[in-house]
Regions:
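C-terminal cap/linker of serine protease catalytic domains
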Residues: 108-121, 190-223
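Catalytic nucleophile loop of clan PA
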Residues: 166-187
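Short, solvent-exposed secondary-structure boundary/capping segments
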Residues: 102-105, 158-166
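Short beta->alpha transition motifs characteristic of CBS
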Residues: 70-75, 184-191
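A short beta-strand motif characteristic of beta-propeller blades
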Residues: 42-44
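Secretory targeting and sorting signals
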Residues: 1-31
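Serine endopeptidase catalytic core focused on the charge-relay Asp
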Residues: 46-155, 178-179
Length: 223
């Protein structure tokens, strides 16, 4: 099923079925042998029924192992499984979901996850400013994998960047990068998948909101 998102002056159709964010886990436990590998671009299952993509994984100022995904993928308390290893059980929980900026925070269990900074063809080393026209941006999604395209920029100054990049259901939350710099996430497409523009929230807006709110996600830095 699609989520319908209002993006600026257009109706945007959500590109995924669910969400994934936040898992529980205390202290500095080490991942066990064979723990699911999770990073920006990993597929996740929310509440054992919906699929989305992890934007990034890292630590916040409180030392928690946290990640991001699209806000329409789930609500606080939603359980998260690894798509590649459902047998590993619940690996995290959504702890916060912001429907205005359409992002969510997941707290992962450090004893059940192996966090990495590279999935597929995307490596994330830092978080940066929004993409500007005519930059080329790329994403790594659990459905369509690695695709790239021309960024049009934040056309309506709404903390969302438009890009000509193929995304479909399940890609929601996918990291959008320039090189190894994370600049945004995938949230929606306009009109027709892989033909209409992709629309996604800027990472700068997400980071600013997490820092202002405090708690899980504040002071975030990628693995």
């Amino acid at each position: 099923m699609f989520n319908t998102l209002v993006r600026a002056a257009h109706a945007a159709f959500a590109v995924a079925l669910g969400a994934a964010l936040l898992g529980t886990g205390a202290g500095v436990a080490q991942a066990g042998p064979g723990s699911p590998v999770i990073g920006g671009g990993s597929g996740i299952i929310i509440d054992n029924q919906f699929e989305c993509t992890v934007t990034t994984i890292g630590h916040d100022a409180g030392g928690r192992l946290v990640g991001l995904t699209a806000g329409h993928c789930g609500e606080a308390g939603s359980e998260v499984w690894s798509e590649q290893d459902r047998g590993a059980g619940v690996i995290g929980h959504f702890v916060y979901s912001n429907h205005d900026l359409d992002y969510a925070v997941i707290q992962f269990d450090p004893g059940h996850v192996t966090p990495v900074n590279r999935i597929g063809n995307v490596t994330i080393t830092n978080v940066g400013a929004p993409a500007q026209f005519p930059s080329i941006v790329c994403k790594e999604g659990r459905t369509t994998g690695n695709t790239c395209g021309l960024a049009f920029g934040d056309i309506f100054q709404t903390d969302e960047t438009w890009a000509e990049m193929c995304v479909v259901e399940g890609d929601s939350g996918a990291p959008v990068v320039i090189g190894t710099t994370l600049v945004g996430m995938v949230n929606a497409y306009l009109a027709v998948a892989c033909f209409g523009p992709e629309v996604g929230t800027n990472m700068s807006a997400i980071v600013n909101d997490m820092n202002a709110r405090g708690g899980a996600g504040a002071g975030y830095a990628p693995i």
